[in-house]
Design a protein with these regions (language model features):
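Cleavable N-terminal export/targeting peptides
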Residues: 1-39, 242-247
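Transmembrane beta-barrel strands of outer-membrane/channel proteins
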Residues: 45-51, 80-84, 152-158, 198, ...
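Short sequence motifs at beta-strands and strand-loop junctions characteristic
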Residues: 39, 58-61, 126-133, 184-191, ...
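Membrane-embedded beta-strands of outer-membrane beta-barrel proteins
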Residues: 45, 66, 134-138, 152, ...
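Extracellular loop and loop/strand-boundary signature of outer-membrane beta-barrel proteins
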Residues: 51-55, 120-126, 176-184, 219-225
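Repeated loop/turn-to-beta-strand initiation elements of outer-membrane beta-barrel proteins
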Residues: 43, 75-80, 146-148, 200, ...
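Gram-negative (and chloroplast) outer-membrane scaffold detector with strong preference
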Residues: 70-174, 189, 234-240
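Short glycine/proline- and aromatic-enriched beta-strand/turn motifs that initiate or cap beta-hairpins
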Residues: 33-72, 84, 232-247
Length: 247
């Protein structure tokens, strides 16, 4: 793993720890204020920062997350979820399908026989990435705390990714030319998983939302042999508006 990737992973772990500590502190502080929330709005809107982390392909992206929800009842809502983020990933031969690994092995053998392969050479292809996610569905809420709302949800949606390889030497340029003749790789597929989070209520209409999702997808299945798990963390303001939903 490169130094920059290690820094990103360390940053991810620090963010997760900070979010867990913040959640614990707020829950402890809200313990004396147990009780059902008196005001629950019909609609909510979230817009904030997000990051995606897929260790399988060393992907890390920063971006924007948007949600809009309608609450038919106090305990559940139906909503729309969209995120867009950009960053980088890294491809290595072990991630490729057996057919592509065999083709790559043949190419490296030819280069070695011609004396064009440096001693100890390893194939590493960095790439810039842009990812969009789109989903819609239900979310369940627990409102036992007057200042805190807990929620969970299933995740089922579509993910679209554009990967643009950044070859660093003539050999990786040859490999990229075979994998992506157009200079970039685009794909979309379905993902599934689960998510949840916490709304910290500052007033009837304004809250801080902290949330996370863990999903599985298999993007670029024509060249990558395995799917991958992706974590998405988001934080930002949430706005509640509309009429109060009666109990």
């Amino acid at each position: 793993m490169s130094y920059s990737s290690q820094v990103k992973r360390a940053g991810t772990h620090r963010v997760i720890k900070m979010l867990l500590l913040l959640t614990s502190a707020v829950l402890l502080a809200s313990a004396p204020t147990l009780g059902q929330q008196q005001y629950v709005s019909r609609y909510d809107l979230f817009a904030g920062y997000t990051f995606l982390d897929s260790p399988k392909v060393k992907l890390f992206e920063n971006g924007f997350h948007f949600q809009f929800g309608v609450r038919p009842k106090r305990w559940y809502s139906l909503g729309f979820d969209y995120s867009v983020s950009g960053g980088s990933l890294t491809l290595t031969p072990n991630l490729l399908t057996p057919a592509w690994q065999q083709q790559l092995g043949g190419l490296l053998q030819e280069l070695g026989a011609a004396g064009q392969l440096p001693p100890g050479y390893t194939v590493v292809v960095p790439a810039n990435s842009l990812t969009q996610t789109l989903t819609a569905g239900p979310q369940l809420a627990y409102r036992h705390f007057s200042k805190v709302t807990l929620f969970v949800r299933p995740d089922l949606g579509a993910i679209h990714e554009v990967a643009t390889p950044q070859p660093k030497d003539p050999i990786t340029k040859l490999i990229v030319g075979a994998l992506t003749p157009t200079g970039k790789k685009t794909d979309w597929t379905v993902f599934y998983g689960f998510g949840g989070g916490i709304d910290f209520l500052f007033s009837k209409h304004i809250a801080l939302r902290v949330q996370a999702d863990l999903v599985y997808n298999h993007l670029f299945s024509d060249i990558l042999q395995d799917g991958r798990l992706t974590t998405r963390f988001s934080v930002g303001p949430c706005f509640n508006f509309g009429k109060n939903i009666p109990k």
